[in-house]
């Protein structure tokens, strides 16, 4: 049955089935090791290596060590030659388990974070999407930005950091992932040697319990008539990463697509909303997005437009949502499925994104979902499924809206809410 389902794209299926296998091993303390062998955040110092010595050790290997934080995950990653794997694992273990957290290092990173906060304020897209999370998930952890307020960065102490690490850096919550010329058995042996000391127990009743992140239909406006363009995002509550509705919503987002004023094509663009944007000069750019978290998500459209086109663009954006719920066609879905498959494959171009993908999959699903399985799930989506799932998440739902800039023309929230359904018989 599965073979029959994938028969129309048999050449693609053959290439996906031939993709490298991701192997997974769990240590006795709960730490998971995942690797995929192929043929081709800021870190402070550790107790063994001060920050300057750590940087020198990484540079002497010709490697790259960094870190990043998202709303649900923190990652430390290193890119290095295969022959330096033992040293790389040792350094990562030191960073995770033995950070020195000296006052000098903390003060240095404090200034780095404050500078990053200033840079984020200069990215109006980041500001708009942070405001969207703040209003959509108000009063919950997802409502906070990744960097947090500047007051926190200025007042954070060493004791705060130590308490956080002791509460959250536990083996069952960690994944050691690799991609490239790495033998899985060798990696497991190195992990046992370097990470076996990671605790899997919590002190007393200190087990962190995830907070329920409820969605609230609401709006937040930051009007500034001196700005040249308006930045606006509208979203409804989406599906969590493990929801069976995630793939139909990805297809739906692919139907809406994205647009930039620099695109060629004009009225010949594949996305209906993109064609309207080009023909009617509705906006400078827009993109459909779906931010998925463990138990919820945001399904939305972000656009940048002239202050005189806000009402028109908002109308057609919501109209595109209503079309997904009522009149999406076979050709729309077929085009979107092809675009989505190409996007998923293109995102794994290199060992760094592959490694990141492995780590997130193990944390979210407990396994790495192969591309062949994604392909099968996407191919199983039909127009009826898209209409049903979009009706479940979009139709007659309260949206969350964030807007920054010259937004006098942005409709009243009640008008935007009333455009989330059609009075048709």
Residue ranges and their predicted role:
Residues 3-4, 10:
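Aromatic (phenylalanine/tyrosine) cluster motif
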Residues 42-47:
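Active-site SXXK
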Residues 1, 21-22, 26, 37, ...:
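Charge-rich, well-structured scaffold segments of protease-associated domains
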Residues 9-40:
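N- or domain-start disorder-to-order transition segments that initiate the globular core
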């Amino acid at each position: 049955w599965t073979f029959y389902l994938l028969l129309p794209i048999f050449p693609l299926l053959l290439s996906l089935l031939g993709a490298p296998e991701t192997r997974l091993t769990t240590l006795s303390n709960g730490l998971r090791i995942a690797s995929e062998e192929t043929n081709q955040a800021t870190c402070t110092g550790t107790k063994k290596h001060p920050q300057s010595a750590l940087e020198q050790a990484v540079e002497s290997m010709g490697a790259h060590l960094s870190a990043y934080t998202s709303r649900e995950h923190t990652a430390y990653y290193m890119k290095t030659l295969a022959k330096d794997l033992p040293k790389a694992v040792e350094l990562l273990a030191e960073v995770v388990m033995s950070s020195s957290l000296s006052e000098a290092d903390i003060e240095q990173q404090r200034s780095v974070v404050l500078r990053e906060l200033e840079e984020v304020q200069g990215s109006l897209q980041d500001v708009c999407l942070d405001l969207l999370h703040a209003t959509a998930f108000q009063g919950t952890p997802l409502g906070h930005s990744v960097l947090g307020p500047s007051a926190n960065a200025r007042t954070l102490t060493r004791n705060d950091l130590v308490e956080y690490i002791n509460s959250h850096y536990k083996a069952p919550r960690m994944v050691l992932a690799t991609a490239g010329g790495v033998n899985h058995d060798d990696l497991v042996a190195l992990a046992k040697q370097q990470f076996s000391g990671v605790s899997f127990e919590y002190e007393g009743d200190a087990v962190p319990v995830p907070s329920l992140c409820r969605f609230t239909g609401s709006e937040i406006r930051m009007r500034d008539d001196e700005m040249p363009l308006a930045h606006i995002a509208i979203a409804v509550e989406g599906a969590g990463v493990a929801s069976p509705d995630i793939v139909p919503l990805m297809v739906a987002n692919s139907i809406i697509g994205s647009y930039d004023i620099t695109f060629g094509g004009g009225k010949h663009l594949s996305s209906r909303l993109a064609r309207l944007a080009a023909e009617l000069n509705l906006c400078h750019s827009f993109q459909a997005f779906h931010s998925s978290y463990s138990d919820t998500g945001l399904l939305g459209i972000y656009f940048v437009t002239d202050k005189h086109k806000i009402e028109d663009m908002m109308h057609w954006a919501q109209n595109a949502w209503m079309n997904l719920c009522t009149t999406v066609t076979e050709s729309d879905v077929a085009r979107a499925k092809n675009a989505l498959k190409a996007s998923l494959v293109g995102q794994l171009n290199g060992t760094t994104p592959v490694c990141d993908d492995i780590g997130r999959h193990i944390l979210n699903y407990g396994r790495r979902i192969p591309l062949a399985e994604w392909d099968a799930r996407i191919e199983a989506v039909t127009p009826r499924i898209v209409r049903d799932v979009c009706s479940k998440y979009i139709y007659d739902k309260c949206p969350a809206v964030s807007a920054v800039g010259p937004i006098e023309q942005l409709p009243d929230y009640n008008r935007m809410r009333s455009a989330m359904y059609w009075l048709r018989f």
